[in-house]
Amino acid sequence: KTGFWSSLLTPLTYLIVNGTLLVIIWQGYISIQGEVLSQGALIALINYLLQILVELVKLAMLINSLNQSYISAKRIEEVFAEAPEDIHSELEQKQATNEQVLQVQELTFTYPDAAQPSLRGISFDMKQGQILGIIGGTGSGKSSLVQVLLGLYPADKESIDLYRNGRSPLNLEQWRSWISYVPQKVELFKGTIRSNLTLGLNQEVTDQELWQSLEIAQAKDFVSEKEGLLDATVEAGGRNFSGGQKQRLSIARAVLRQAPFLILDDATSALDTITESKLLKAIRENLPNTSLILISQRTSTLQMADQILLLEKGELLAIGKHEDLMKSSQVYREINASQHGKED
């Protein structure tokens, strides 16, 4: 309701201004014809009125800005009112084999204040160095699953176990430190390529390590062409880089962290299939102990995955390799056919 009246404020102000001018000009014409008012007096009256009306327009714009600021302030207050997260509370310690890194059993998750769960009864496991693919349509639960894996939301019951060298994390802070995450919509910050790559790192890194991460992310070639190389300028929002270049730089930043888990959430969507294939092969060859979780809309991206989760309406519809799903899942075949024109 507030937004409705705010949107009407400016056009209503201009309507009143122009309507008033029209009335004055019409009445002035009548007064001049009756020799009650001179032409000079009419022009002076219009000029004075315009000055007043211009300030009224400014006042209307100020009121609109204040209204928007008030709404934004209320939202910020809601964020500050949230209870702080306790990321240092100890989690239950568990052990597993060195190969086992992720185990999900009957995962169910419901967003706060939501009536229905977004994820229901999802189970799978993952071994060290494997590639896990996740695919599904809009509303299938891909984003919800990622947010739970990242520790941003708790599951409805304890159903996710994360391991590193056979041991589970001590607390939520350590849980999150084990995961590098790259979203589809990536952000670069004003500075240099070096400052963007090392953003958030707690340890010093060498130029050799920076170039290695760029090479894995298939970003070395275009960075080598930049004036200043690693110290080349990055404009705010990465405006001087294409979408694919920004995605590759963000992947290089995640690779540099050397976390045991790497999640690429549709983070190669702006890359062509050849570059994408080279990038995924480079991750597998150069980071053999890193477990990669790959969310994508393209079946071609997931063909090298050790297993693929096919989600639909928050449930696990099918699981297996690309070849297995092509044989066993009609839904997966339809997704593949819609992208390639045939069921291959």
Model region roles, listed by residue range:
Residues 46, 53, 176:
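Conserved catalytic core of two-component sensor histidine kinases
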Residues 85-97:
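Pre-NBD coupling/linker segments of ABC/ABC-like ATPases
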Residues 96-344:
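ABC-type nucleotide-binding domain
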Residues 1-19, 34, 65-68, 85, ...:
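An intracellular "coupling" helix at the cytosolic face of ABC transporter transmembrane type-1 domains
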Residues 20-27, 54, 71, 218:
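Transmembrane alpha-helix boundary/anchor motif
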Residues 4, 52-79:
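Cytosolic ends of transmembrane helices, especially the final helix of ABC transmembrane type-1 domains
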Residues 34-47:
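Membrane-water interface of transmembrane alpha-helices in multipass transporters/channels
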